[in-house]
């Protein structure tokens, strides 16, 4: 995988650009002025980051694996030590599919009903391959989401493992990673 050079990263004019940021030269970045990238984060091949007015915040030591997307008008926050596996889609905006309104961004706003809500992944959260995270989702510290799960726009209590469509609590997650973080610092 080839990464953008420091000069190429700086030319994108991110809201904030930390140290040791690695972005694949095959990733697509839209509205970089609304994207905060902290130290030691990595964005792999074919990822899409499309920041709306709410922006995208990527914390320290965050990994976004290949083919993942972060898209929407509201904020999307991935706190320190969080990560998303391949083909994860995170949306802070979603059209109304009921038929009462018209979907799609090509339609004038007065004919649409868009669910715009922030998405928050707290420290030490991980989202498995192929999962979908919808507007309003709040994954508290230490949450793990299984592969191919559907994460609804609600709060998920800390240090639990969730899986399924929709994602449901499976079992508690160990907290040893907090001690490892302390040792690392």
Positions of predicted regions on the chain:
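N-terminal segments that cap or nucleate solenoid repeat domains
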Residues: 1-32, 37
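Flexible, glycine/small-residue-enriched loop-and-beta-strand segment within the central core
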Residues: 5, 27-37, 42-133, 165-166, ...
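Flexible glycine-rich beta->alpha loop in the catalytic core of nucleotide-sugar glycosyltransferases
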Residues: 88, 95-96, 149-150, 156-157
